[in-house]
């Protein structure tokens, strides 16, 4: 039988469908853990897998979705080995009937159920270790041959991931376990599938494009989407995945929306309707299709029989659309008209991959380089070179000063931030990690890791949440031998300087030769040309009047080769008066030669003017929209500065700044920022930006002149409300929401300490119980709600996870609690939620119930008798505020 890695992306493959809902039909009780059936009822698990294989699944998942040491501290290895044996038994059984079939086994693992820092309390490295313990028990089976000739497991399926950072931890754990065991990457492909909402965002705010950028950088074999939505609701996400990805895309929707019938969870889309919708998704080009919650072997059988794919060439691989990728692009894919429904016989779509398009990403934003995209602005100010105050901040550990440098550059228009914290007298690795952590908390921009030390580079790339830029490599063999393996492991867009053992060539031809050498060496490591951005090196014209020409010629030559280029623009004007004008003019000339990106100071107005005008005149500013918007803001800025009688820049958060710290809200009703002193008070501003230290300092200052209650009502709560509304409008995302909550928490801490000292301690708004229901160990959503409720001054009684109904009722009676919040992630535990609600209504009739979680809908909540359905954390907060008025 052909190895899975040899057929991935070359022909349409079918995955299996749901597990939990099918096992419920086989007798799985509410709260019972499916993994225990691997040893308790192995014949039923074998039958489950066999039914999917017989229905047409090429790949089935092992029954190990929740197999973590935290859940099974004593029997993890036994359950995992049994799960793999059960799947292999099913495969051998179906091969007797269909000896020429292609049948593969995916080792399946889901989310660990905890939020990673800074959103939660799980450390990134602890998360990696958690996944490693699971993989260490499973992956030896990838070295053990099955009777069919393949290994007992043929790929890794990391699925139902709500957080890109956890996805990265899982992928690194898989890669490092494979390396420890000597398993080649091609022998055990890694597939990662995330959960997206209707707005195409994960819980932590990632988009399909940001996930593709990071996961492809990490070297996964396929990316995808599963769970949460039905096939029609998934359509925008699937289209965007297929547009962005150059690896195969997997699609596994739910069978619509869940509801409870006779105590069991069922879904509202029948098999025939499910397949009709899947045919529409197939037009976008996913090469792996299956089902998730609510789907059964019947669904997979009908899916396979009605999606017959002719041809199996590499051209069928899902990839970027025929038009180059652009950030924010929402055009239909080439070959697919909007709303197209495919015929029953489908041929894989052919995608014209554009190798000259590179990208970097943060958790929530992707930036594309090259092609029709605008030259990218990389902010240079987080760098101690020539900056006395910055050096002092590094020596003193003044992280807030450094973070403000990043925030100012983002507001001024930077799209990527360079991060260099190298000073001989400090621990650069420790400082780099601290700055990276804090910057990623307060800015949406991708970062460029700028260091000459390999250990600092590796630590930073490992910690970074996204796909970063890496500054830098050069043509020296020793440097390439050191840097390329690190970048290959973690991913990144690598800046490559055109210098080698002989120094910096004066002429363009020799610089181009070094670039070609770097490309060739990178290819040996499997690093694509689109992941290399050549820096032709801008030299000072004050010492060589022809230096600018040599650099521009190199930019043009690399561009004509289909390569990407970046420059530290300001070097060209070193030693000259009025440097900003020389630098801006050189910037324009280089953009005309094909420059992809510039490391520059976005606070210099001439540079921004040059960039705006170039985009306008080169056809990169459709309908002149960006230029007109900017010119209006620029006019206001000049009027303000003129009225002050001098130059300078406007302060952070002022109305005339060019952009907000988060993306625009896409045309929805604007959110008015809190009032007080300027556009925002210092405290509100600190909360909005998630600055804990600043929030505490601003609160202490306010307490000198202002009553505590006034601070809460006029500064603190307005800041939280502002972030909450932007979260609801999808212009801020969960990381920013939780960082704002942490900043508010530090402010509340100062207020409480002051009130205790003065004997004025106030009572909380009310008591609220929260719990994850019996049988469910996932508490991510519950913990998010807890953080927000506490910051709105509620006393939260957290009963934890896997909580029996009787325990909830007892706690409610004890404190006569008015509101109980219940959470569930898995469909198999909704029955326990219904049981808890019924018991609460009977024993505690005064209490209201609020429910939430990945499987919940308004209809579902109504069916099980809940008083309120919280679609997200802020929805729950608003309900609590209304209830406790």
Model-derived segments and spans:
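Intrinsically disordered, low-complexity repeat tracts
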Residues: 150, 312-313, 318-342
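Domain-level signal for soluble alpha/beta catalytic cores
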Residues: 1-311, 328, 335, 349-533, ...
